[in-house]
């Protein structure tokens, strides 16, 4: 699995929190039987910081199990979350193999299995395995901010559609879990959990980025340009021209970017 550094995670956290569906999070929280939560690809603990206010007091002291490939991110999470009520446990795990037999079921005993910005990176096989492990444990699930392929930029540029299409092709490259689901991930997850008897709900959770998020916009534009050139080297000049103009819009305070995401919650009756 490709890593994400702490600076990037901190940069996106405020936009993530604004975009997420509070209604969907509240709906799944109301259905929890306890407060044991498994957070997959937890990074520095942003998911905990978002979710903690939704857990009902009658569930008891929360127990958070944060799992990630990167021990350094987990160490930072432990520091940032050290004053939280309840138990915060971190565990460095190779997530690409964590669901394969004979590995123990990470989901066992967990009231909620959750992740943020993960599902579009994983493969059909991995996500099917996760759905099976969650069903075996009868865990509710909440998956936030799954990229759905939507990118809209204004002011418009002639290459916007080309870059978006190249980025979406790049999203399907193996990210360490096998061929990535990319923009198809949320729909595939809905089918996988429904097939196992889950009630599934989805809500949009788009990033709406304006002049209050210039650095995040800059990082996105540069990352998208790199991805587009990796897929189509012959388009390097066009992509670089697009990048220069898009960054100029950001610098001038006139750039608006919408990035499509979906939140998904599911539970067993």
Kindly label every feature range from the protein language model.
Residues 107, 199-269:
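Conserved Class I S-adenosyl-L-methionine
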Residues 1-32:
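Class I SAM-dependent methyltransferase Rossmann-like catalytic core
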Residues 114:
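A conserved beta-strand element that flanks and buttresses the S-adenosyl-L-methionine
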Residues 45-98:
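Class I SAM-dependent methyltransferase SAM/SAH-binding core
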Residues 139-204:
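Conserved catalytic/acceptor-binding region of the Class I
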Residues 121-134:
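A short, conserved alpha-helix within the catalytic core of class I
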Residues 98-108:
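Short amphipathic alpha-helix with an adjacent loop that forms part of the alpha/beta core around
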């Amino acid at each position: 699995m490709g890593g994400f550094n702490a600076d990037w995670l901190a940069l996106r956290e405020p936009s993530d929190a604004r975009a997420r569906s509070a209604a969907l999070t509240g709906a799944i929280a109301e259905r929890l039987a306890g407060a044991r939560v498994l957070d997959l690809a937890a990074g520095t603990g942003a998911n905990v910081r978002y979710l903690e206010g939704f857990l009902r007091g009658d569930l008891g002291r929360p127990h958070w199990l944060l799992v990630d490939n990167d021990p350094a991110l987990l160490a930072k999470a432990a520091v940032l979350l050290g004053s939280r009520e309840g138990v915060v446990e971190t565990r460095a795990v190779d997530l690409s193999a964590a669901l394969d037999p004979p590995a123990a079921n990470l989901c066992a005993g967990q009231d909620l299995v959750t992740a943020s910005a993960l599902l579009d990176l994983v493969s059909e096989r991995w996500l099917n395995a996760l759905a099976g492990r969650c069903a075996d444990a009868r865990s509710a699930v909440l998956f936030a901010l799954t990229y759905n392929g939507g990118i809209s930029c204004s002011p418009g540029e002639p290459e916007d559609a080309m870059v978006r299409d190249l980025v979406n092709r790049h999203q399907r490259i193996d990210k360490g879990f096998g061929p990535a689901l990319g923009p198809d991930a949320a729909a595939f997850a809905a089918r996988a959990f429904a097939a196992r008897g889950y009630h599934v709900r989805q809500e949009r959770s788009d990033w709406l980025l304006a002049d209050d998020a210039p650095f995040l916009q800059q990082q996105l534009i540069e990352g998208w340009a790199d991805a587009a050139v990796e897929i189509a080297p012959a388009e390097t000049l066009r992509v670089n021209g697009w990048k220069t103009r898009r960054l100029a819009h950001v610098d001038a305070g006139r750039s608006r970017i919408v990035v499509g995401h979906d939140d998904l919650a599911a539970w067993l009756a």
